[in-house]
Amino acid sequence: MGISRKRPVFLSADWHNLLFANYTVTPSLLEPLVPDGTQLDLWNGSCFISLVAFQFRNTRVLRMPALMNRDFEEINLRFYVKRALANGDVRRGVVFIKEIVPSRLIAWVARTLYGENYVALNMAHEIQNDHEGPRMVSYSCGEKGPCNRFSATVPTASLIPGPTTLESYITEHYWGYSETGAKGTVEYEVEHPQWPVHQVSEYNIDFDFQSLYDARYAFLSESSPTSVFFCTGSDVTVRWGTKV
């Protein structure tokens, strides 16, 4: 029997009601943020950045229920990279530009242990389920109140995306990468099953990307995403990171 090389589990949770808005951008926007040892991962020659909003539920740290904030929202801005291994394999992963949560404690833990750019803001969400019709999903955040909003009407129909689709590219990056100063690049594994996708045509994105992220992303406030879709989600496991 072979010995598992997987790292120990750091965090497990349910990720639910995920909204994705995916924008085509020029690679030069993201190249300064690419962690050492990785490179941008393109889809059909195009570079993407994604706004993702979802719910954490039943959060467990080191296999123990979180004492506080087991259920909360997250909104993140992310892009996609890959790392070539010596044996020829390729690991496809995500780099987070900024992750917004409603708790200062959660933000501190994530910054300290993973070097991720987490911040705490006021947040809210609303999920309206209609078992016979569309689902209404809304997330919002802001400094003085939830003034930035991402909402959508989600149809009931869903499908498993094919391996070469944009939806598969967006949802099936199973590694995370961050640069933590003197520690260099940290790589961690994220495990979840393949998610069925609901295509979304009715949505509203009212975000001040400049104030939330940086002036370089201000153009996204006036841009239309290439695609918007929804995933119900699943249980997710995040393993301890390691320097690469």
Predicted stretch roles:
Residues 1-62, 213-244:
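Hydrophobic, proline/glycine-rich low-complexity stretches
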Residues 9-10, 30, 54-56, 66-79, ...:
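Aromatic-enriched hydrophobic runs in primary sequence
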Residues 21-23, 79, 202:
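Short beta-strand element of the conserved SAM-dependent methyltransferase core
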Residues 26-28, 54-59, 82-86, 102, ...:
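Generic structural motif
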Residues 44, 87, 92, 180-183:
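Feature targets compositionally biased, intrinsically disordered low-complexity regions
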Residues 60-144:
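Aromatic- and glycine-enriched beta-alpha-beta binding-site module
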